[in-house]
Amino acid sequence: MEKMEKVEFIDVKVVPYRLLNPQTVETILNKIYDLDGIVRVLVHGPSIPKEIPYGPAKGIKVNHKDRQVIKVKGEEVELKVKVGEIIVGVLCDDKMDENIGKIEKIMDENLPCSYQMWVGTYTKRDVTVTDWMKYGPKFEKKLDPRYIGLVDPNSKVKENVKLIK
């Protein structure tokens, strides 16, 4: 098996004490993507379904005010979660500490509540059997390394991952 180019980065995990509204998420993501050395950004939180998935009301549309389309660097991104956690991948280079400080400043200026921030490894870095199941054999040459660890093998990538350049 041939090795794909490895991207060395560290994760900065930000957990606000409250779930964030779409406008706050849009502002924060745009400011983070303005920084140099950002590899990827993941948002995580409770799902906001389009329809009720099970039970007696199964199939009925859910009209949730926070399931919105936001613009991040000119790209439209549909928020499918109520954001409660942001993980930012920062390149391990000479600007890493500076970028971590800038991320902290962005959070201080834009979050309406207190938060906790940790630096460490919170996402997968290496190809696993799950990735092989999802993408098939010999995918290493074709796959952007930023996809590693982002998608459940049973989900559709384009429904759950949005690459912002």
Curated annotation (Swiss-Prot):
Q: How does it assemble?
A: MCR is composed of three subunits: alpha, beta, and gamma. The function of protein D is not known.
Q: Fetch the Pfam families from UniProt.
A: MCR_D
Name by which UniProt lists this protein: Methyl-coenzyme M reductase II operon protein D
Q: Does the keyword Ribonucleoprotein apply?
A: no
Q: Which residues form a coiled coil?
A: none
Which NCBIfam families is this protein grouped with? met_CoM_red_D
Q: What are the protein's UniProt keywords? A: Methanogenesis
Biological process terms in GO annotation = methanogenesis
